[in-house]
Curated annotation (Swiss-Prot):
ATP binds at residues 148-210, 232. This is 5-formaminoimidazole-4-carboxamide-1-(beta)-D-ribofuranosyl 5'-monophosphate synthetase. It is an enzyme of class 6 (ligase). InterPro entries: ATP-grasp, ATP_grasp_subdomain_1, IMP_biosynth_PurP, IMP_biosynth_PurP_C, IMP_biosynth_PurP_N, PreATP-grasp_dom_sf. Its cofactor is Mg(2+); Mn(2+). GO terms for molecular function: ATP binding; ligase activity, forming carbon-nitrogen bonds; magnesium ion binding. It catalyses: 5-amino-1-(5-phospho-beta-D-ribosyl)imidazole-4-carboxamide + formate + ATP = 5-formamido-1-(5-phospho-D-ribosyl)imidazole-4-carboxamide + ADP + phosphate.
């Protein structure tokens, strides 16, 4: 961990009233089902919301308490932290929390108990660390290029952090790479520091499945909770154009995620789906203890050889979990009732309180 020490978090947790725990999160990303799931398991809920963005949470009535801030990043301010601690809050991280609060602040300044592994958030954000987790687990991944001058076939170019696909692009040569970098910088999507940390990997042609898992530290078991695919702008609109028109216009499609839709995968591929998750969980335990505690996502492509290839991970609840707020076919198979990712998180916290094992799932 950074300057936030585990023993200090445990001391705060020891002073909490375990009969009155509040589940809290930042008002964005996946907060609707995080809070609704907490309510379904009997918890009070709280949301830290940027001024002017509270309407969805009021309309859906998912929060018992509101902490309104000028900017999302204010969640790390001491007065906000104290309000959370006074509520006996356990904070659930998600992509927007990481992006707005900032990893340095989460590691060094945010002295509020968090569900899951605080340390692993940096491992998903930094491409080399993310890749190390996959390599250690011997998970099938795309080939990586160390320098744009080596590009000799179609590649996907990505950048650090939780961006929702913004700035990603495909290139087939060093010249095309440089041209598209210049265009992205002109749009204000990239800075020189981003370019220096560009992640270049082979473009895998296949169907996209974002696979959502939950690792229970209490039961030492990986659960498959759901899958989704993405609506991405502008590539989804671009591919609906006739081929002639695509060739005639000078457009570089972007891959900005604008929404998600649920998916199921061919049943014969499920052994690969479980195996790759089990491998990743074990490598995470080894490289960044206590590992992938709670929700995580493996973003994959399935090629025409029916190989499931992982190109990215999320080490916390992923935006695609919004597709199964009322449960998915896979969570139904496990639980026989509606089970969202938010509810599964709350259930883990509830079980940990009963077993007096909160320290296993909190950092």
């Amino acid at each position: 961990m950074g300057e936030v020490k585990l023993e200090d978090i445990f001391e705060i947790l020891d002073n909490y009233d375990k009969d009155n725990i509040t589940i809290a999160t930042l008002g964005s990303h996946t907060s609707l089902h995080i809070l609704q799931g907490a309510k379904e398991e009997g918890f009070r809920t709280a949301i830290v919301c940027e001024k002017g963005r509270e309407v969805p949470y009021q309309r859906f009535d998912v929060a018992d308490e509101y902490i309104i801030v000028d900017k999302f990043k204010d969640i790390v301010n001491e007065d906000v932290q104290q309000k959370l601690r006074d509520m006996n809050a356990i904070v659930i991280p998600h992509g927007s929390f990481v992006a707005y609060a900032g990893l340095d602040n989460v590691e060094d300044k945010f002295n509020v108990p968090m569900f899951g592994n605080r340390d692993i958030l940096r491992w998903e954000a930094e491409r080399d660390k993310e890749r190390a987790l996959l390599v250690e687990g011997e998970v099938r991944i795309p080939y990586k290029y160390d320098n744009p001058s080596e590009i000799d076939r179609p590649v996907m170019v990505k950048f650090p952090g939780a961006r929702g696909g913004r700035g990603y692009f495909v290139a087939s040569s060093p010249e095309e790479f440089n041209k598209k970098i210049d265009a992205m910088k002109a749009r204000g999507w990239l800075e020189d520091s981003d370019v220096a940390n560009a992640h270049i990997e082979e473009y895998v042609s296949g169907c996209n499945y974002c696979i959502h898992y939950f690792y229970s530290a209490l039961e030492d078991e990986v659960e498959l909770l759901g899958m989704d695919t993405r609506y991405e702008s502008s590539i989804d609109g671009f591919v609906r154009m006739p081929a002639k028109d695509q060739l005639d216009i000078d457009l570089s499609p972007s891959y900005v995620v604008t929404g998600n839709h649920p998916a199921v995968i061919r049943e014969s591929l499920l052994p690969q789906v479980f195996e790759m998750a089990d491998k990743l969980v074990e490598s995470a335990k080894k490289l960044v203890a206590p590992g992938l505690n709670g929700p995580f996502c493996m973003q994959t492509l399935v090629n025409d050889n029916l190989e499931v290839i992982c190109f990215e991970i999320s080490a916390r609840t992923d935006g695609g979990t919004n597709t199964f707020m009322g449960g998915s076919p896979y969570s139904y198979l496990t639980y026989g009732k509606p089970m969202s990712m938010g509810r599964r998180i709350a259930l883990e916290i509830k079980n940990a309180i009963k077993k007096e094992e909160l320290e296993k799932i909190i950092t």
